[in-house]
Amino acid sequence: MRPLRLLAALVAIGLFAIGCGWSPPGPAPTSTQACGSTDAPSPEVVSQAIAGLPQAQWKESARGNTPDCRLNWVVVTAGDASDSPMQVLFFDRNNPLGPATPEPRTYINVISTGNDTAQVQYQWRQGQDPACCPTGIGTVRFQVGEDGKIKSLDPIPNP
């Protein structure tokens, strides 16, 4: 009887995990080790960019760069919950380019998708999605334009 209960519990946990949202796997974030310190934004420049965001207790949660070392990003979050506001700040080496969107979003992930392009994955809750498991998903590619400004190559999803 005991093994049957254990099996039933494992099946229930597995079904719950399968039904709790989906996030496609992406490549590992790029490393800043391939680029020199002059290719990345300084701590002071990052702090100034964070200071320009809406008032919150922002803290860095991730950073990366494209293989050509020009486009850098810093992801900041305003909390520890899975649905806390987040923002992506872009930099052309040590020059701030601004955030990916005017307003913070939740459930953001950034990956490098080409030599000079970063892809931001946005997720959002739909219907009765629990906070842990958003099912809405969209991606936007960003790169530094010829004018030196950040530009999106795809429409930004509007949840």
Task: Name each region found by the language model.
Residues M1-L10:
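Bacterial N-terminal signal peptides that target proteins for export
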Residues I13, A28, R125-Q126:
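Residue-level signal for mature regions of secreted extracellular proteins and peptides
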Residues F16-G19:
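C-terminal motif of bacterial Sec signal peptides marking the signal peptidase cleavage site
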Residues G21-S23:
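Bacterial signal peptide processing site
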Residues G26-D83, P157-P159:
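Extracytoplasmic low-complexity, Pro/Thr/Ser/Ala/Gly-rich segments
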Residues V75-M86, F91-N95, Q123-Q126:
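Short, flexible beta-strand-to-coil junctions
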Residues D92-L153:
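Extracytosolic low-complexity repeat regions of secreted or lipid-anchored proteins
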